[in-house]
Structure formats: structure tokens, C-alpha cells
């Protein structure tokens, strides 16, 4: 079964436009590096402007594949950019799938 990797961050609502801009800009830095990784099935980047939250969710073929993001230079470079605008991150978690629905 696939592995779901979840990275969550929080930001002050006054910085929502900065957080959104940086998330959009991160696509340029990350897209080709991510698509080159073996095992990537899906990748989602989202923002909740009401609660001041952002999320990166990815789905991987295996736990080993998901952990490749732990050392991906392009990904590691993004964190301090977001933190400079006040984004704080929770611990990244990797969830082994127990069941799914795919309509």
C-alpha cells in the first residue's frame, strides 16, 4: 500500500499573501526534482487562508521512497525561505496506508 507524507505549517494571517506567494514560487524550484524521484504517485500543495495553515501532502509507492524528501536539496532549501516569513512547521510524518477509497 502507498505511503502518505504530510508536512504542515502555520503562519500569521497577516502574512497569508507572503505564504501563498512563496508556495506558488516553490513549484519552480521543486517540480522537476520531485517528478524525477522514484515512487512519487501524487503531490499536493495547499493553503488555508482562514486558519493560517499550509500543507504539502505527497503519496509514495513505499516508505523508502517517501523518505527521499528528507535529503532532497531543493526541498531542504525551501524551509528556511518560508520560515523567514514566520511560517513554523510541525514534524513531517509518513503514514503507511491501511485502506483507501478511489472513486
Predicted regions and their residues:
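Short S/T/G/P-rich N-terminal loop/turn motif that feeds into the first structured element of a domain
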Residues: 1-54, 61-73, 84-103
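A common structural junction motif
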Residues: 76-80
